[in-house]
UniProtKB/Swiss-Prot annotation:
One of its GO terms (molecular function) is heparin binding. Residues 19-266 form a propeptide. Homodimer; disulfide-linked. Interacts with WFIKKN2, leading to inhibit its activity. Interacts with FSTL3. One of its GO terms (biological process) is positive regulation of lamellipodium assembly. GO terms for cellular component: extracellular space. Disulfide bonds join C272-C282, C281-C340, C309-C372, C313-C374. This is Growth/differentiation factor 8. PANTHER family: GROWTH_DIFFERENTIATION FACTOR 8, TGF-BETA FAMILY. It comes from Taurotragus derbianus (Giant eland). Acts specifically as a negative regulator of skeletal muscle growth. It holds the Pfam family TGF_beta. Residues 1-18 form the signal peptide. The keyword Calcium does not apply. Synthesized as large precursor molecule that undergoes proteolytic cleavage to generate an N-terminal propeptide and a disulfide linked C-terminal dimer, which is the biologically active molecule. The circulating form consists of a latent complex of the C-terminal dimer and other proteins, including its propeptide, which maintain the C-terminal dimer in a latent, inactive state. Ligand activation requires additional cleavage of the prodomain by a tolloid-like metalloproteinase.
Length: 375
């Protein structure tokens, strides 16, 4: 009993020496720690945003198989960009497309862009073939995007200059061939009879899928084509070599190739905004502005929402694979902690100039973060 009393006295003496406990001070310390944690989280997200933007620039160039961004000036773009229906329709698609709502479906995308449409502008022929002493129009080079995909559609687009009176126009598309014994240097592809009314000029499309298929099978037979569109007075209305004021009216090929559908699976995660205090793994908004990059070679979109993942991962929170938690429980020292990463990515459609001056409309996979999780 005496020993117990001595112990109590010693305990009371220690409390007196230690002094009173200030509960408000502890509360302030806790609040300061929480504020410091929030500031660190904001700084972390800011650094993550910057890193994500740089990674996106590298990804886009890599997925488009470009070593560097094409060096195309705004003036050159104005001259090269066709003012034609198919291209205007593609650009209009970007104007009306909103951010698609995520339904939890996760595509198994390939790494590189899967091309849907290629708009090919004419180039100078390496063979320097001439017809009647004049440079021919037009010669088209085809990239691997066309050569190694299944061809769905190939349209040649030509622009006919306006007429002052109602006129019947006879259009001919000729394929250049090696000179024959009788001197023949071309064979017909298509002939058209068009009725034009006074006013503005018109775009006319011609199906050249069969010709393109033959060229792809036998590249040496591709010597180019000749375009003629004569009115009743013998005046050629086809714009083959644009004159001043005819920028964007050069003939071009619109080629469509197949795109293989992919499987999908389900996934879910948290969504946050830039003001969120959520510490767990979460998806945050991030807008990529190509004009801010100085990337004028991207025609559309000029910007898009890419998003990024940030936050802490506990072993019981949003793990991508169910066995991750079990592995850690079995061997906590031998397994690294889970990381906050994208678990669902979706593609973006892009209209752009490649390094050869061709206009490409393609789908670039895994460019938008739709879901985040721990794995």
């Amino acid at each position: 009993m005496q020993k117990l009393q001595i112990s109590v006295y010693i305990y009371l003496f220690m409390l007196i020496v230690a002094g009173p406990v200030d509960l408000n001070e502890k509360s302030e310390q806790k609040e300061n720690v929480e504020k410091e944690g929030l500031c660190n989280a904001c700084l972390w997200r800011e650094n993550t945003t910057s890193s994500r933007l740089e990674a996106i620039k590298i990804q886009i160039l890599s997925k488009l198989r470009l070593e560097t961004a094409p060096n195309i000036s705004k003036d050159a773009i104005r001259q090269l960009l066709p003012k034609a229906p198919p291209l205007l329709e593609l650009i209009d698609q970007f104007d009306v497309q909103g951010d698609a709502s995520s339904d939890g479906s996760l595509e198994d995308d390939d790494y590189h862009a899967r091309t849907e449409t290629v708009i090919t502008m004419p180039t100078e022929s390496d063979l320097l073939t001439q017809v009647e002493g004049k440079p021919k129009c037009c010669f088209f080079k085809f990239s691997s995007k066309i050569q190694y995909n299944k061809l769905v559609k190939a349209q040649l687009w030509i622009y006919l200059r306006p007429v002052k009176t109602p006129t019947t126009v006879f259009a001919q598309i000729l394929r250049l061939i090696k000179p024959m014994k009788d001197g023949t240097r071309y064979t017909g592809i298509r002939s058209l009879k068009l009725d034009m009314n006074p006013g503005t000029g018109i775009w006319q499309s011609i199906d050249v899928k069969t010709v393109l298929q033959n060229w792809l099978k036998q590249p040496e037979s591709n010597l180019g084509i000749e375009i003629k569109a004569l009115d009743e007075n013998g005046r050629d209305l086809a714009v083959t070599f644009p004159e001043p004021g005819e920028d964007g009216l050069t003939p071009f090929l619109e080629v469509k190739v197949t795109d293989t559908p992919k499987r999908s699976r389900r996934d879910f995660g948290l969504d946050c905004d830039e003001h969120s205090t959520e510490s767990r793994c979460c998806r945050y908004p991030l807008t990529v502005d190509f004009e801010a990059f100085g990337w004028d070679w991207i025609i559309a979109p000029k910007r898009y929402k890419a998003n990024y993942c940030s936050g802490e991962c506990e072993f019981v929170f949003l793990q991508k694979y169910p066995h991750t938690h079990l592995v850690h429980q079995a061997n906590p020292r031998g397994s690294a902690g889970p990381c906050c990463t994208p678990t669902k990515m979706s593609p973006i459609n892009m209209l752009y100039f490649n390094g050869e001056g061709q206009i490409i409309y393609g789908k670039i996979p895994a460019m938008v973060v739709d879901r985040c999780g721990c794995s």
